[in-house]
């Protein structure tokens, strides 16, 4: 899954004591944010195999440090602890828990779309429901989760809604290109492109949220 992950960010931002939207954007993609440099460094492995699924050409054959269930739980705990260490406040624990759950949500949503390439631990017992092999349904799920979360978010703010909706539309167009466009030229190019997208999306989210009046996070 790609842009659907951001639906979790939008929904979580609606909750009391939630961290800023840009931070939630990073949290829901943290496993992939780590995956990209791990691939570039040769720690995790991926290759381009057109047709391996009907909508994603990436053969993610070795990624135990970012996308095993055990690793996802550990990275969630690390993110929770790091956010909690930044200070106290009446909502600090709740905000830290949201960050941790946002990180873990990545694995849960990936489980739905991936073929069985997500290990439960180390590089063994790989699982995945394989919705990527049904591109129309996979794309519909991405759109539904993204805009469902955004609807919750926009329902709790009084700023301009159109810019955020347009942002979501652009993200969905990028998702369509990922699904139905040509495959990446290399595994390294895929990793770099993904990492740039995560940073740019988080930056845009931070910029757009400045115009929204929503309950301010009370966590430190």
Identify the role of each PLM range:
Residues 1-220:
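N-terminal membrane-targeting hydrophobic helices
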